[in-house]
């Protein structure tokens, strides 16, 4: 808008309408679900996005498989970014230096750090809570001093509630929400690590891993899968595919489902999966 570019809003995501609109656009901003739907349409090819300069994604992690399929189909890459209502965009991949599975480096003027449960800063490669600091960070929540106290430090850092790690170059990789972390038998399990492996299995469209109450372990790992037509998987198949992961991370049960429940922003609503407010098969 600052450069005088036209912004076109569509009333809803309909694949054919979006493909038609791409012909007169240069930038597309979407969530991973949108890219998956575009790739499912035979009309989406290099010619359909010939005028495009930039594709960006946010709000939810994009699988490495979707990244690879998009590049193979179009010859372009999707630039993943990281932001939130409290601070706008904080980090981004560079258009000439995209790493699938990462949301890139902090933008100029912003800082990102990873801390443990005691608030101590962790080293590169260690997983913990993502904290951010920068000029666009909001001053606080409206009439919510309790929320401010829980999320802000005295020196200006904001606790995002996201779990992630920084590599040796300070590139950020997200593992999920701290509220999504599963504690089973006293061990911390990050669902994204399991989902990334499951999503690579032939015939799996997408997956979601959640924890549900378990009398012995506190929480049991449960997997929900969306499968291609005619494909079936059972727990034994899943165990074989997940052989690279520690045994305690393997799902105790799995359910196939027509589609993962999502909100308007395309984020998977794992709370509905935890409380069985879906129709697993």
Where are these regions (language model features)?
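ATP-dependent adenylate-forming carboxylate-activation enzymes
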Residues: 5-24, 189-197
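AMP-binding/adenylate-forming catalytic core of the ANL superfamily
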Residues: 31, 134, 139-140, 155, ...
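Active-site glycine-centered loops adjacent to acidic/histidine catalytic or metal-binding residues
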Residues: 59, 83, 104, 162, ...
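Beta-strand->loop->alpha-helix junctions that form or flank phosphate-binding loops
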Residues: 79-85, 104-106, 210-213, 255
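Conserved ATP/PPi-binding loop(s) of AMP-dependent carboxylate-activating enzymes
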Residues: 105-109, 120-151, 187-189
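Conserved beta-loop-beta connector loops within the AMP-binding
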Residues: 113-131, 150, 168-169, 231-235, ...
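Acidic/polar alpha-helix N-cap and adjacent early helical turns
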Residues: 275-281
């Amino acid at each position: 808008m600052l450069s005088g570019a036209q912004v076109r809003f569509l009333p809803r995501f309909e694949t054919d309408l979006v493909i038609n609109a791409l012909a007169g656009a240069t930038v597309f901003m979407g969530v991973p679900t949108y890219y998956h739907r575009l790739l499912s349409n035979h009309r989406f090819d290099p010619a359909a996005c010939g005028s495009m300069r930039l594709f960006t994604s946010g709000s939810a992690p994009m699988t490495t498989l979707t990244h690879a399929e998009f590049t193979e189909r179009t010859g372009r890459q999707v630039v993943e970014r990281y932001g939130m209502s409290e601070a706008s965009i904080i980090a981004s991949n560079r258009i000439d230096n995209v790493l699938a599975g990462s949301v890139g480096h902090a933008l100029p003027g912003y800082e990102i750090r990873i801390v443990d449960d005691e608030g101590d800063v962790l080293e590169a490669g260690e997983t913990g809570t993502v904290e951010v600091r920068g000029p666009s960070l909001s001053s606080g929540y409206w009439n919510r001093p309790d929320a401010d106290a829980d999320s802000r430090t005295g020196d200006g850092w904001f606790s995002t509630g996201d779990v992630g790690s920084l590599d040796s170059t300070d590139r950020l990789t997200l593992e999920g929400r701290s509220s999504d972390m599963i504690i089973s038998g006293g061990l911390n399990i990050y669902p994204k690590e399991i989902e990334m492996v499951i999503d690579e299995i032939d015939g799996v469209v997408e997956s979601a891993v959640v924890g549900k109450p378990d009398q012995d372990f506190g929480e049991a790992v449960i997997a929900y899968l969306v499968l291609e037509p005619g494909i079936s998987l059972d727990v034994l198949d899943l165990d074989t595919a997940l052989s690279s992961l520690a045994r305690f991370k393997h799902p105790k049960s799995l359910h196939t489902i027509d589609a993962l429940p999502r909100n308007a922003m395309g984020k998977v609503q794992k709370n509905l999966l935890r409380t069985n407010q879906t129709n697993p098969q």
